[in-house]
Amino acid sequence: MTMCKPVQDKLVAGEALCAIALTEPRGGSDAANLRLRVERDGDFYVINGEKTSISAADQADITVVFGRTGTPESGAHGVTALLVPMDTPGLTTSRFDCHGQRSIGRGSIFFENVRIPVSHRLGDENKGFVQVMHGFDYSRSLIGLQCLAVARVALEETWEYITQRQAFGQPLSAFQGVTHPLAQYDTEVEGARLVCLQGLWLKDQGLPHSAEAGMAKWWGPKLAYD
């Protein structure tokens, strides 16, 4: 892990961007059933497979890749985390056309015989599942807030529109059939935001927050979509 400190310094200084490569095409963030293969070859690991729906896939300077070093039957006990520079030979990316997330974007990362020194391993071999699960609840609350930002902007633009648009000699905002649904969504967006903040506050206090994180991850994206 000799190269981790310089990378950490760059990340803290805002000089580098890191992606988290966990999700795979066959399913969501199911860390216990990863298929991307990571095989030991002397002082190197060789990576083959695909990660998909990865935030900043084509913008990141480096990515933390979670892959299977154990057998498929080993489940959660055969996952290892590696720090992989995005300019490593054999690594390619593609970008999705994502509405609402253009500043960050998402995409796929493809690994074809990508060789990474053993020194790039984060933690112990086959122990990566524990590492990623520790960060899941924190990220779920943040994802909820990210989606709610889109919902909030959509509501603000809609309120502005109905106060300007005229119908039957009045602004649309004068009609309760128009404003009542918007008021309901305003209430729900604010409620979901507080759930996200509660989850983050509980984490800061060192308290259990898995339930709140799950609520945040479900409610925030749903409201943004609705």
Please state what every model-predicted region is.
Residues 1-14, 55-62, 203:
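Internal helix-loop-helix
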Residues 1-2, 28-31, 44:
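N-terminal glycine-rich flavin-associated loop
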Residues 10, 14, 40-45, 108-110, ...:
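Alpha-helical interface subdomain recognition
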Residues 13, 26-35:
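Active-site-adjacent elements of ketosynthase-type condensing enzymes
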Residues 14-22:
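A short, Trp-centered hydrophobic/proline-enriched beta-strand micro-motif
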Residues 33-35, 87-115:
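Flexible, small-/acidic-enriched active-site or ligand-binding loops
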Residues 44, 48-94:
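A short core secondary-structure module
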Residues 52-57, 100-102, 138-142:
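Glycine-rich phosphate/pyrophosphate-binding beta-alpha loops
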